Curated annotation (Swiss-Prot):
Signal peptide segment: none
Family statement drawn from the similarity comment of this UniProt entry: Belongs to the group II decarboxylase family. Sphingosine-1-phosphate lyase subfamily.
Protein name: Probable sphingosine-1-phosphate lyase
Source species, domain of life: Bacteria
Pfam families recorded: Pyridoxal_deC
Cellular compartments per GO CC: membrane
Protein's organism: Legionella pneumophila (strain Paris)
Amino acid sequence: MFGFISDLLTAAVSSLDELLQDTPAHQIILGTAALYFLYNQYHNPSISRWCRSRNNASMKQRIIDSAYALAKNLPGVNQIIEKELNKELSSTREKLRIQRSGMTLREEIPEEGLSPQDILSAFDVDVEKCHFDFLSVTNDSPEREFLVGRGDGKDSGALYAIHPKELTELLKEVYGATALTNPLHDKWPRINAMQAEVIRWCQNLFHGSKEGYGLLTHGGTTSIIEAMAAYVIRARAKGIDYPEIVVPETAHAAFKKAAELTGAILITVPVDKKTGAVNPNVMSSYITRNTAVMVGSAPSFMNGIHDPISELGQLAKKKNVPFHVDACLGGFLTAFLDTSSEPMDFRVPGVTSISADLHKYGCCPKGTSVCLFSEDSPALSVYAALNWSGGLYATPGILDGSTSGARVAEVYATLSYYGKNKYQEIAKSIIRLRNAIQKELTALVEEGNGLTSEDIYVYGNPQWSILGFRSNTCNAHFIADELEKRGWKLNLLQNPDGFHLCLTHVHTLVGSFETQFIKDLREAVIDVKNYPPGKKPSGNVKVYGAVGMMPVELQKEICKQYQKARLDFTAASHGSLGIFAPSSTEEDDGLRNRKVGEQKVQTSL
C-alpha cells in the first residue's frame, strides 16, 4: 500500500517537473507564494481576519500604500514628499491666515476680568442687531429674528434651524439657571428627572418601550461610539477576541472611529451601485461568528438614501446579531413623517439601538444627540468601577463622566417649545422643497437647452432631505467649485466623485430657493462643460484629487497637521507642516488601542 502511494507521488512530481521545466524560476516562486497566500486567506484565521479588515481599501489604495511603505525608507524621499505636501496645503494655511488676520488673538487668559461688552466683541457679533441675511424672505415669520450667526441660505446642512427670538431668550435664561448643575449627582433631582423625560420622549418618538434605555450625548459621533463600544465589550465578554462591526460602505466615518477606539475590526459591505443601499443578502455573507453588531443607515450622510431596515432587521434576527440603526442625520425628520409603510425604528423586529441627533432636525443647541437601546438589547452603554479606591463609580454611558445639566435643560426647553405639530410642519416643508428641486432639475434636463441627465443628475432615489449630485460627462467636483464661486457651500463626496445639498428648515424660509439653486446649478454645469482640455483643479477640488493619490498614512498625517493649525493661530500663518518631524507620541491613543486588539494578527504576518 505504502509502495503504491510512493510510486504515485514520484510520478506526480516527475509530471510537475516536466510541466514546469521551461518556466522561469521567478514565476514559479511568485506562483507558489500566491497559492500559499490564497490558501491562508481562507484557512488561516489570522490572515483571514487581516484580509477582512482591509476590505474597505480599494486595490488602487492598497498599491499606493504598499509602494509608499517600500519607498519611505529610501534616502531623501521623506524630505521630497514633505516639500510637495507643504506646497499643496499652502493655500489652506493662507486661507486660515486671512480669516484670522483681523482678529485680536490672545496667548493667555486675561490677568483681569473683561467686561461683558468686551467679551462679546470677540465673537464678531453685533449684539444690538444681528439678523440672518437671506437671499430673499417672502414671509414675516418670527424666525427672522435670529441672534446667533449670519448666512445667506446657501450653506448645505450647516444651520438646521432659525430660532425665534423668544426661544433664544428662553435658552439664555435656561443656561444661566443650569450651567453649573451636574446630572451625575443627585443634588439636582429636577435635572435628573428632565433627562429621564427627554429619553422617554425620544423612545416614544422612535416607537420604543418604557423599558428601553437611552443616553443624551454630545453628538452623533459620540452616540455611535457609545453603541458600538457596548456591543464590542459584550462580544469580548462572550470570548470573541476579534469583534467585527459590519457596516455598509456608505455608513458614517464615525463607525471607523468607533472601531479604532474599541480595537474592533470594521467590515464594510458594498452597496448596490444603482440604488445606493446595501443588499441584505450581500450583508449576510459578511456576518460571521465574530460579528459584534451590524449597522444600517436611515438615511446615509452621503446621498440621503436609507438602507432596507426591515429586511436588515430580519437578517439580524436570523443571525442572532445586534442591529444598530444610524439615524443621526435624519432621525428627527423621519420621526415626524409617515413611515408606517417602511418603518426604520424600533417597530422593526431586530433593531436593538438607534442613534439620532437632536441638534439637526430636532432644532436643539449644537452638541446634543441621543443613543437609544431597545428593551431586549443584549448590551447597554453603561460603565461601572465598583472596586475603585475612591468609592463606587458608575456612569450612564461609557465615555462621559460629569456633564453640565444645561445640555439636558436646553434640550428639554427646545423640544417643549416646538412641540410635535411644529416639527411635523418643518419636516413636511423640507420634503416639499426637496420635491420642488427635483422637479425643477427634471424640467431643466428635458428642456433641450444643452444639458441632459448625463450632465447632472440626482443619484439613487432619495426620499428625505439630501440630494446627491453626480455627472457622467463632467468632473462633479468642478461643478461644486463653480457653485462655490456663486456663494454655495456644498459637501464634496468621493468614491465616486459627487456633491450633496442637505436641506434644512433654513432653506424652506428662502423665497424661490429651488429656482435660484437650479439656475446656479445650470450655469455651473455649462461653465464646466466649456472648460479647456487639461483644466487643472484648484481649491478643494485640488485637495480631494491629491488626497486620493496619497497613502493612508499621509492622509491621516495631513488631517492631523491641519487640525493642529486650526487650534494654533500661529501655525496657520507661517512655518512648514513638519510632517516627518520626530514626535514624543508616535501614534494616536485610538490607534494604539486598536493595535492591542490586532496584535496577534500583525505578529502572525
